[in-house]
Amino acid sequence: MTIQCSVCRNHVQSMYCAHCINTSPNLLHPLRMQLLMVQQKNKVLKGKVEDILSHALDKNWKSSDNDTEGIILADRLHKLEVLKRTKRNNRVRYRISQLTKRIENKQQRLQSLRLQITTTDVAKVSNANKKEIEEIRTKYLQLNEVVKREQELECQSLVDWFILRKRNSYEIPYTLVFLPVVSLKNFHKLPKAVTISSLHKMFQFLEIYSQIISFPLLYKGDEIKEKTINTDEEIAKLITKLVINVLQIGRFKNLIPKDAIDLVWLLDQYDVDSLFYNVIVNHKMECRVVLFHWTFGKVSKVVTETLQLPAGSTTSFPRQQVGDTYDKDDDMWHIVG
């Protein structure tokens, strides 16, 4: 049975029924043979293609046929790989160029902002802001002047309260609450109790004075409050602390150079009492400048050597008599008029 086109009447395909196929094997046998031959050709072609691909991909190729197809395919695949790499490199290069441009733009922006920061001054500020700044500056200067005047008045009140005086006397040129201000030259001439009392008042004065000028002291003189001063060496350490406090206040008030000073020359010219008085009354002092870093131990050594105290001394030097005073360490009535 054949299929016929109803338009052109052309026989396109034959069709057999199941009965004919089962009863006539010769009809199906040629078709089966053709199918087997096609399958065999497909296997051969498949093996050939695999060999060509194996050769093209640099695998072990052992085909006995002509390898022209493999060489051509390998060349094409190599070109394809080169094109892929080129495309990928171009994409990366383009991305790098874009990032480079962004970085350059950001650098230019950064430079422009820095230039604006460095070139911005009061002239670029608006008139309202300039007026506000001037008002704040004026108020600050006024408050600063008020604070300075109040500090000066309080300092003068403190001087009057402690009765800090300068006397026309060589041995005792300065007094504080009617007690002689301790110096290196009158140290051995005053009773020990008077020396300790004088140092106690001087530390009290400096503590209140530092609070007025808002300057913290390095040393407070707590040894006097605890009454643990027994030897001249301990008194010398107390004088060292006093000298350091006075020097720090003098530097804070710009009365003494802030560079490394010649402390030996300064104490020789002014001594402790004159140094104390000049700093309190705001007298500027000239001083030699040296390349030397002063520490507590070095200042203590200068004070000890000036007082001519032996190192590690545990005893007190005998006191000399000054005026009508008595040579007693427990004399608390060494009052100067």
UniProtKB/Swiss-Prot annotation:
Pfam families: ATG14. It is a peripheral membrane protein. InterPro entries: Autophagy-related_protein_14, UV_resistance/autophagy_Atg14. Keywords: Autophagy, Coiled coil, Membrane, Protein transport, Transport, Vacuole. Residues 5-20 are annotated as: Cysteine repeats. The gene is ATG14. GO terms for biological process: cellular response to potassium ion starvation; cytoplasm to vacuole targeting by the Cvt pathway; pexophagy; piecemeal microautophagy of the nucleus. This is Autophagy-related protein 14. One of its GO terms (cellular component) is phagophore assembly site membrane. Required for cytoplasm to vacuole transport (Cvt) and autophagy as a part of the autophagy-specific VPS34 PI3-kinase complex I. This complex is essential to recruit the ATG8-phosphatidylinositol conjugate and the ATG12-ATG5 conjugate to the pre-autophagosomal structure. ATG14 mediates the specific binding of the VPS34 PI3-kinase complex I to the preautophagosomal structure (PAS). Residues 87-153 form a coiled coil. Coiled-Coils at the N-terminal half are essential for autophagy. It comes from the Eukaryota. Its main location: membrane. It is found in: Preautophagosomal structure membrane; Vacuole membrane. Belongs to the ATG14 family.
